[in-house]
Amino acid sequence: VEWTDHLVPVDRVIEYVRMVKKGARQPVTFCENYVPYHTKLAPLVAELDFISIHTYPVWEYKHIHDALEYTKENYVGVANKYPEKPVMITEAGWATNSNGRGIDPDNVNEVLQEIYYHDLTRWSEEEGIITFVFEAFDEKWKGSSDELEPEKHWGLFKSDRTPKKVMRPYFRHLVKEKV
């Protein structure tokens, strides 16, 4: 992504992909937001065994009711551009807290995360799209020192490993009853 402080030029990524492919038996890919695959990453695609995209509707100011449709557009846009390559979603998720930095605080909570998770997994299973949900656990060390920094709150579990609303039905034995 363009905002990173350690951006690697595409021609250098191509060199790395070629180097890895010489020594690996596994398929090789490169994980990135969906947008660069429409432009600057086009030369890289020929070197990849499959394409890996990230999609975060909430970072792009999408309401939960538009989120899955937006995710589909991101996926289909890349898949249609490169019909010869399999495409998977290697990061997709919904934050549960925000201080307003990049994400409207009214557009994040555990209920909305649960809706997006179920919509996303239902669609990807129906379509046979390999999808990885970002992320397993909140990472309280990420982002700024502000406790509500959205980078800290993408997990399906809190940083203390207790399940958020979306995971509670699957991990009831981890949730203490409120007295």
Features from the language model and the residues they span:
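Glycoside hydrolase catalytic-domain groove-lining segments
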Residues: Y56-R101, I129
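Aromatic-rich peripheral "rim/lid" segments of glycoside hydrolase catalytic domains that contact
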Residues: D104-L112, W123-V179
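Aromatic- and acid-rich polysaccharide-binding/catalytic face
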Residues: V1-E2, E32-Y70, W94
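Surface-exposed amphipathic alpha-helices with a cationic face
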Residues: P9, V13-R25, Y75-Y82, T121, ...
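Alpha-helix N-cap and loop-to-helix initiation/capping positions
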Residues: L7-E15, H65-Y70, D104-I115
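A short, acidic, amphipathic alpha-helical segment used as a generic capping/interface helix at domain edges
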Residues: K72, V76, E114-D119
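Aromatic-lined carbohydrate-recognition surfaces of secreted/lumenal glycan-active proteins
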Residues: Y16-H38, E84-A95, I129-W141
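Substrate-binding cleft/loops of secretory-pathway carbohydrate-active enzymes
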Residues: V35-H54, N99-R101, E139-E151, G155
